[in-house]
């Protein structure tokens, strides 16, 4: 029987149960009983807090992509709109099917109108993507590629096809919003501002890590390890961007740091799930590294 995907708190519980079983700390019967009730177990965090935590994550990503005070406020408002659409989609199959396109259209419209009014600085797309980052299928892309590498062709191809379709729908929503608002082409240039200095990436990592811990109801004791891998990922990504700006070197180094960092944590703390400390890094890498920002800029950039 296929059920909903496991939350990270459930993944952590599975890893802990496996470790305790292999270490003879718990009998098989107790481990089996724990695993059987795991999928139906309620989250430790109320649903409304889990939903609002996405706004925190979006603001954290904004601090990395477009660190400006006004941009932070507008991205937070757009993310709140996306969260509202996510809640609606739980009761509407049509909305759920078209959610990436609808959410991208709504968020992009809000940000472009704010940019047209002169409320935010820098490239508008860099303020759009943090608001819709929660819908970008970074985990699916990683899992699909991993399955293809492991010769699991059917599962890997299916995941990649679904992830690419999600990205295409998000891109179409952005393009429609641009056609509707028809902003000044200069607002669509990939220009980054930096009004907060070194505090921006530090605070961004904390907000992303804390928001994901709330949303996935992860044990708070795992937060330091999640923040460590996130900080390592961001540092490697920044160094790569400084070394080779305008290329994928920063993304490659960031992804490598996330993989290596999570493996090191798993060795140091075998009771912790490597997946739990690894996946949050995708919210750092995904918005500007999956091609969505680049493709949208190519489609919309002024001649």
Task: Name what the model sees in each region.
Residues 118-123, 181-196, 300-302:
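Membrane-interface helix termini and inter-helical loops of multi-pass transporters
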Residues 58, 82, 86, 107, ...:
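Alpha-helical transmembrane segments of polytopic integral membrane proteins
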